[in-house]
Swiss-Prot record:
Catalyzes the O-methylation, and thereby the inactivation, of catecholamine neurotransmitters and catechol hormones. Also shortens the biological half-lives of certain neuroactive drugs, like L-DOPA, alpha-methyl DOPA and isoproterenol. Its EC number is 2.1.1.6. GO terms for biological process: artery development; behavioral fear response; catecholamine catabolic process; catecholamine metabolic process; cellular response to cocaine; cellular response to phosphate starvation; cerebellar cortex morphogenesis; cholesterol efflux. Binds 1 Mg(2+) ion per subunit. Substrate binds at residues 187, 213, 242. The chain crosses the membrane at residues 3-19. The N-terminus is blocked. The modification Phosphoserine is found at residues 259-260, 264. This is Catechol O-methyltransferase. Keywords: Catecholamine metabolism, Cell membrane, Cytoplasm, Lipid metabolism, Magnesium, Membrane, Metal-binding, Methyltransferase, Neurotransmitter degradation, Phosphoprotein, S-adenosyl-L-methionine, Signal-anchor, Transferase, Transmembrane, Transmembrane helix. The lineage of its organism: Eukaryota, Metazoa, Chordata, Craniata, Vertebrata. It holds the Pfam family Methyltransf_3. It comes from Rattus norvegicus (Rat).
Length: 264
């Protein structure tokens, strides 16, 4: 019995140390995504992403992107947490779009289309957004979301893995260089895909990289690279994790051209 108590105590201590290491933001995400959501899906007989789309279709105004964003934010605040960029960080994204007025934007990670709607609604006539999404179900929901918002002509959805699609952009999708890249996919892909964009000649002097979730869940290797390279000028925007009072942030990295990876 004492041995069992000691073992339990050590297990609890290890769990607490793990939680401290991960941070409560990641723990909260884990709880929502891997505990509550599967139970909810089982009870409802559908997926969270389908429920978000249905809520938008029932509560937003067709052809009105702002009402689509507000409906998604309402659902994710009041009903189920979801990994959209959210309104707090979304306002930072809006400011960046307005400042640089990009003609060609690449988004890595579409999810349900929230950020695609958010960016596309601010693009100038003739500008376009390419969004890459590996999950075919998410890609289908993003297309329906864009159709409902009336933005389908501004956005092209590319279904597949970013590392496979990026090398195809020049020949298959008529891309010379990109004006802006929004990174919001797998966090361990931020750095490899940034390097791949450089290697493929898709970045020009002045290309804006805007990366979400650089604090939670965090992208330490990406931040170390862009902040430590004279190829980028970086600005950090502190904010909150979507729909939570957990500190997160966006990183803006403006490409300066190829150079030494170490700043002098």
């Amino acid at each position: 019995m004492p041995l069992a108590a000691v073992s339990l105590g050590l297990l609890l201590l290890a769990l607490l140390l793990l939680l401290r290491h991960l941070g409560w933001g990641l723990v909260t995400i884990f709880w929502f995504e891997y505990v509550l959501q599967p139970v909810h899906n089982l009870i409802m007989g559908d997926t969270k992403e389908q429920r978000i789309l249905r809520y938008v279709q029932q509560n937003a105004k067709p052809g009105d992107p702002q009402s689509v964003l507000e409906a998604i934010d309402t659902y994710c605040t009041q009903k189920e947490w979801a990994m959209n960029v959210g309104d707090a960080k979304g306002q930072i994204m809006d400011a960046v779009i307005r400042e640089y007025s990009p003609s060609l934007v690449l988004e890595l990670g579409a999810y349900c289309g929230y950020s695609a709607v958010r960016m596309a609604r601010l693009l100038q006539p003739g500008a376009r957004l390419l969004t890459m999404e590996m999950n075919p179900d998410y890609a289908a929901i993003t297309q329906q979301m864009l159709n409902f918002a009336g933005l389908q002509d501004k956005v092209t959805i590319l279904n597949g893995a970013s590392q496979d699609l990026i090398p195809q952009l020049k020949k298959k999708y008529d891309v010379d260089t990109l004006d802006m890249v929004f990174l919001d996919h797998w966090k361990d892909r931020y750095l490899p895909d940034t390097l791949l964009l450089e290697k493929c000649g898709l970045l020009r002097k002045g290309t804006v990289l805007l990366a979400d979730n650089v604090i939670v869940p965090g992208t330490p290797d990406f931040l170390a690279y862009v902040r430590g390279s004279s190829s980028f000028e970086c600005t950090h925007y502190s904010s909150y994790l979507e729909y939570m009072k957990v500190v997160d942030g966006l990183e803006k990295a403006i490409y300066q051209g190829p150079s030494s990876p170490d700043k002098s």
